[in-house]
């Protein structure tokens, strides 16, 4: 089952990031950055006793009046969107307030907003470094969110009690080893109004056995586990996600953030685009997120029935050329012309996604890879510099998902990007790897020990 998620929210300068870092230092923690659109959303995994949970840090929430007065309106809107996204995905929200300041108008506004989310909330009064501050923390009871938990994130005071409180309120998700853990996860992503919801419904309308709905990590989405032609799969839905906003860019930014989280959990993303509209920067941005996450991708060109009706014969070839130009950075991604309304090619989209899943897990024998490398070098040797040249020794594939190839050579820093692209193209020409990015890594081969030392080591 997915890890339970916890979001830390509150107004600026109450110590949210300090608390985040303090929680991650408990036991063993893995920290990673989850890129946002203007600021990074920071995400980590916390382990406490027998519990593991994901933890989001968010930017400070301003009051509506402060937002109106802000000279960085766009940045403030982005920060607010990040926080709202984290709250929507959370199983539990930690609302951090400042015990040294007492309740403020900003605290009241955040509290009112959190009440409307119907999320479980832990009220945490930070900066309670003394008994007097702990007593002051009691004032926050008037916010109506339960008893405040006094802590000092800076000094670690009260952190164990806070972690125990988190453990009590989070849902327990058993690792039962059922099909969901092994089933390929396919995310349906794209900008608003391209037909993601219609495509999902068309897929679910195909004849198959729906096993069970799985609660997703977002407020608006439900992951669905089903059996597709004998193969268990999980569909991750990001369809129908909208955020009321004053400006279009805010809505656009929010939709990309939602798609981002779905992509992180997926193996393959079906990127839905609208055939009746020109390709946009947002289409490219969502595709870029898939590649950044090193996931597989299938491009589903939806509403094709409408476009074909308007444009007539020859429309497909011209459109495919435009699509290849728009997504020039992933020429290996398959394109599928579909109509969620009529059901045309809907089945083919899922079939292709499963092909991409298989491609991502392919391993190529080392002997075959080295034969390919020798042929590639013979056909086009690596460029040389005066007095310097690149000599390749061998190549191997140590990893899958995505397929990763490590080339050992004498001067990896001299391998030009154009030659890297050449080697990738040769790999794809022979082995395909449809719909998945592949990683090429260039390393200097470790110098072998002298023969007499190797013999001595073998006898010891």
UniProtKB/Swiss-Prot annotation:
Binding residues annotated for GTP 2, in chain numbering: 190-197, 237-241, 302-305
Residues of the EngA-type G domain: 4-174, 184-361
GO biological-process terms attached to the record: ribosome biogenesis
Sample GO molecular function, one term: ribosome binding
Pfam families per record: KH_dom-like, MMR_HSR1
InterPro entries, sorted: AAA+_ATPase (IPR003593), G_ENGA (IPR031166), GTP-bd (IPR006073), GTPase_Der (IPR016484), KH_dom-like (IPR032859), KH_dom-like_a/b (IPR015946), P-loop_NTPase (IPR027417), Small_GTP-bd (IPR005225)
Annotated KH-like domain residues: 362-446
Keywords: GTP-binding, Nucleotide-binding, Repeat, Ribosome biogenesis
Record: residues binding GTP 1: 10-17, 57-61, 126-129
Function: GTPase that plays an essential role in the late steps of ribosome biogenesis.
Assembly description: Associates with the 50S ribosomal subunit.
Family: Belongs to the TRAFAC class TrmE-Era-EngA-EngB-Septin-like GTPase superfamily. EngA (Der) GTPase family.
Protein name: GTPase Der
């Amino acid at each position: 089952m997915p890890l339970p998620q916890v979001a830390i929210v509150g107004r600026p300068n109450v110590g949210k990031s300090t608390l985040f870092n303090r929680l991650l230092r408990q036991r063993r923690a893995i920290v990673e950055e989850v890129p946002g659109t203007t600021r990074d959303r920071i995400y980590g995994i916390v382990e406490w006793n027998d519990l593991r949970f994901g933890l989001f840090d968010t930017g400070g929430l301003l009051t509506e009046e402060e937002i109106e007065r802000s000279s960085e309106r766009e940045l403030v809107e982005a920060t607010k969107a990040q926080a709202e996204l984290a709250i929507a995905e959370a199983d539990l929200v930690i609302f951090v307030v400042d015990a040294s300041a007492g309740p403020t108008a900003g605290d009241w506004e955040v509290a009112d907003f959190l009440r409307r989310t119907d999320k479980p909330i832990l009220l945490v009064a930070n900066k309670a470094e003394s008994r007097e501050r702990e007593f002051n923390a009691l004032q926050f009871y008037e916010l109506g969110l339960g008893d405040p938990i006094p802590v000092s994130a800076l000094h670690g005071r009260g952190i164990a009690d806070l972690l125990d409180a988190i453990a009590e309120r989070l849902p327990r998700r058993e690792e039962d080893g059922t099909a969901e853990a092994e089933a390929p996860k396919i995310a349906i992503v794209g900008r608003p109004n391209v037909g993601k919801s219609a495509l999902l419904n068309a897929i679910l309308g195909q004849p198959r056995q729906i096993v069970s709905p799985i609660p997703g990590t977002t407020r608006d989405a439900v992951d669905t586990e089903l059996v597709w032609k004998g193969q268990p799969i999980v569909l991750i839905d990001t369809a129908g996600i909208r955020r009321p906003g004053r400006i279009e860019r805010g809505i656009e930014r929010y939709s990309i953030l939602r798609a981002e989280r779905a992509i992180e959990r997926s193996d393959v993303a079906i990127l839905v685009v609208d055939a009746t509209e020109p390709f946009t920067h947002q289409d490219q941005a969502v595709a870029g997120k898939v590649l950044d996450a090193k996931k597989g991708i299938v491009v589903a060109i939806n509403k094709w029935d409408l476009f074909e009706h308007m444009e007539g014969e020859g429309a497909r070839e011209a459109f495919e050329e435009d699509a290849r130009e728009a997504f020039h950075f992933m020429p290996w991604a398959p394109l599928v012309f579909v109509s969620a309304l009529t059901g045309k090619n809907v089945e083919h989209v899922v079939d292709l996604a499963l092909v991409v899943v298989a491609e991502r897990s392919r391993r190529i024998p080392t002997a075959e890879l080295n034969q390919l490398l020798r042929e590639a070098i013979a056909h086009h040797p690596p460029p040389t510099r005066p007095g310097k040249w690149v000599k390749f020794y061998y190549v191997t594939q140590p990893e899958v998902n995505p397929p990763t190839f490590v080339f050992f050579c004498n001067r990896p820093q001299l391998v030009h990007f154009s030659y890297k692209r050449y080697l990738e193209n040769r790999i794809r020409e022979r082995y395909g790897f449809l719909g998945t990015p592949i990683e090429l890594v260039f390393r200097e081969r470790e110098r072998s020990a002298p023969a007499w030392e190797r013999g001595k080591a073998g006898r010891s």
